[in-house]
């Protein structure tokens, strides 16, 4: 079970300013989906993921907003999750969403497939196959799946 640090570190002005500065600069970047074949970059015409990353990754946010939110979560919690929504008819990527949640449980079925059960702020629970997530972690040391949380060092630093 993973619970993001709830000690309100992001409510500290210095912490928020630092994370916001990094996130705003990252929001200016233009990431690209690259496919390599035999060591050479392959041209993929009409690449849906490149389109999403450069314009509107989902109906609710611009590319800059998406990147800023994702990076803010990454630096605040040392874990950031993006949900990949697939078009059920074409099999192509329809949208990508950064996920913000207070609780996450990792589940495993009898055939060792992993699932992430998210509980969102309003109490809604959703279970997603782990393979449909992009999970970026920082300080990936003590846990098999998650980056180490900041709670101990944040409590020490913010109470000093």
Descriptions of predicted regions:
Residues 1-160:
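Structured, contiguous alpha/beta core segments that scaffold functional sites
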